[in-house]
Amino acid sequence: MVENGSLYRRLLSDVRGEVMSDPASLARYSTDASIYQMTPDAVVIPRSTEDVQAVMSIARDEGSSVLPRGGGTSQCGQTVNQGVVLDNTKHLNRILDVDVEKRIACVQPGVVLDQLNQALKQHGLWFPVDPSTASRCTLGGMAANNSSGGKSLRYGIMRDNVRAINAITVDGTEARFSAVTAASGDYADLVGDMRALGRREAAEINARFPKVQRRVGGYNIDALVGNDINMSHLLVGSEGTLAYFTELELSLAHLPGAKVTGVCHFQTFRAAMEATQHIVTLNPQAVELIDDTMIALGREIPMFSETINAFVEGNPEALLLVEFAEGSAEANAAKLVELSQLMGDLGFAFSGAEHRWGGVVSVTDKSLQNAIAEYRKSGLNVMMSMKEAGKPISFVEDCAVPLPDLADYTAGLTEIFARHGTRGTWYAHASVGCLHVRPVLNMRQDKDVRTMRAIAEETFELVKKYKGSHSGEHGDGIVRSEFHEKMFGKRIVSAFEQIKKRFDPNGVMNPGKIVNAPAMDNRRLFRYGQDYSVPEFETTLDWSAWPGAGGGFQGAVEMCNNNGACRKLKGGVMCPSFRATRDERDATRGRANSLRFAISGQMPGGLSSDAMLDTMKYCVSCKACARECPTGIDMARMKIEVLSAKRKKDGLTLADKLIAYLPRYAPKAAKVAWFVNLRNKIGLSRKLLEGPTGISARRDLPVWSSAPFRDVEAQDNDPQVLLFADVFNRYFEPENLRAAVRVLRATGFRVAVARDDRSDRALDCGRTLLAMGCVDEARHEAQRVIDATRDAVAKGVPVVGLEPSSILTFRDEFLALCPGPETEMLSNATCTFEEFLADQPDLPLKPLDRPIYLHGHCHQKAHGAVTPMLDLLKRIPGAQVHMIESSCCGMAGAFGYSPDTIDVSIKMAQLDLFPALEVAPVDAVIVADGTSCRHQIAEGTQHQAMHVARLLDMVLDV
């Protein structure tokens, strides 16, 4: 790391893009999905290739280095280094051209794979290299890594699908690397030198390079052998060490037709390994392995448990997911028959003493196939969901061997693990002999670091025995580069060094990768180095499910393995702030890294620092990460700890108090509703009040009702339903509660409002208090609810609520505020209005001839409560229900009203929600249970949304 004064000043002067050197930003770019951590000199978000050229020139002059970075999902340390990090993802992310006839695409390096394939879908094309990180990995990163995926058996790896690369070399020259025909100038000299090296080393390359498809270790110098040389193939897999990629020309493929999956079950792992070489003779496009540990862990993850139960029979020790795409349903069906016959020929059947237990579960339903594929793609993250101190560690995770040796290789590696007192979990690409396996180790302990090296050395000897590759998919980085001499020999490594020297004489481009690498077990480069520690500190919520300081808060934070699932741009909800800003700071990963630095003393000021608060600024507490992050990062809950620490340090502003104590002053405000509502009507008052209240003058506030809901409106004797009347529906939209009471009674239930008989003050979920970090007061409110509902809950009476962010607090934050059996009983008794009614068969409803568009609240999605709502709406006779596929609406309580966050709030809605409603018919019924969602829709579209209770009340047939 260089002193960054002069470097930083020059970057600020010469670069149009963003330049960052503050500790928090450097921390967020110091790690990837590997075990390593290196603090960069600066981070640059370039806007153009001119920015890139300026950075390379400045870094060269200042004695720094340059690290091109895409999604930061590398598992081997390729994308951590000192020097200047160039983040390509925010601006250099355009699809430049698509030639449909020739099936060629030209893209900038920051284009995300899923983004490209979404654009190609309309043409019936796709880019067929499909790594599991497709939702966030970039094409530039894929080329630099020589990535592959589950379908490489049919489509090959990245090198097989790159036609040309435009790149900037370290001297600032931009050149096109492609099939060699005629070349001139300096580029001709470079080509000539590389061809000479290829001729000189051809025999050694042929003798030393593994004869397996999955071989991505070192430079692709075999691409320099022969007459048909494509110079771009030398750059593929070079891990940013030779040049900066500005444009990639890619070969495309026709989208495969209908697919089917045969799930082969095996009672033993070895049986699955032995069967693989026979299964690939059926010409599937993928054969993927899942072992019993991955099945067990997946069943504990909410978003995967239902899927697993749908395709797994019994308790297999291993599954092989065999995918066929033959172009027609008939051909696919025939392949499934062949697969079943083959399994029978191999001696497997689900019944019969004469067979080994096993067989095929056929999956033809498209939605289930997609769910299975998503589960398999999340394999690493599922593995990392273990809450213990040890984690599955990547360092021998993608060795590749010939299929006939696969069973013996896996048995040998299992023996190595056992000899060192650990175990591994297996999954991934059985079809090409490249299985992912990670031994469980604790990288904080010296003994486990020594074990890692011993396992690596023994494993690579085993790989050599079977003439395999020590790097089959994930590249070299820090973790494998030092072993090239063991695997390739001195002469090949010398050739690697000559290539590096020819392209980059002074080692400016991502030094220490592929050649001249540090030791893989150098703890000074570890995320959890020898000096890493987290001193004990006080937290306000219960984190006892995890190990470590802060009552387990440390362990919860350290669950983040930097896989980057939170950087996806489509599908699900996570992470709405990142989708809006494209800033690493605003992804769940960026926040988790910041938290880790804060609690370990690596970021000044700790949890209460301004930098930490700024990191949380755009977090809307949507809870999407709690459900969609496979390692279970609950950033909304972690944000509460940050807000609590900040409040204890600095107290509350007037604006904070207006939010936090809304339930307490609401009864008084409602009495003068006419006066309070004047703020929306008088422009000057909006502007004058913006500063002290923290409410943007650009927003209308919710309108106070002059006739708020009163508890006495629903106090049936011996109630069968306890209704929680939240502050938002009680004082702003009381007709929602009245409609809910009518619907519940029409369904035959006696209804009573949950209330505190010891106080005149209405019950409160504490949500507004938590939003401002007032945890002790929120805990008091939670205990009031627990006490008030105790007797009814003990009798089995359900507690039902309308506002998702309020009622679902009972199932979530209450468990962390007041842990104990009574809270768990309340949590189990709690349901949303639609969850309760979805189980009731006798709901008298009239037909509705208007289309219904449903927007789910983030907390409904996080708790799996959208499906019951969808099912309930479909019970309306004649209903045409359309589910809006959107992330967070962006209002998120106070977030959308703040002058500091209103623009990001609107941007979130503009990504998915607003476009969906723009095409909705004018007579459509828009259903949104969240009060914030309804207000965002009202302000940003021509539609008015309603709560599902109002719609059901409207169509009641009584």
Question: For each predicted feature, which ranges?
Answer:
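Terminal amphipathic helices with adjacent charged low-complexity linkers/tails
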Residues: 248-250, 282-390, 424, 428-430, ...
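Long hydrophobic segments that form regular secondary structure
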Residues: 226-242, 255, 260, 267-282, ...
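Iron-sulfur cluster-binding electron-transfer modules in prokaryotic oxidoreductases
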Residues: 504, 511, 636-958
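N-terminal glycine-rich flavin-associated loop
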Residues: 11, 34-66, 84, 88-131, ...
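C-terminal substrate-binding/cap subdomain adjacent to the FAD-binding core in PCMH-type
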Residues: 34, 142-144, 148, 152-158, ...
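A glycine-rich phosphate-binding loop feature that marks nucleotide/adenosyl-phosphate handling sites
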Residues: 74-77, 133-140, 213-220, 224, ...
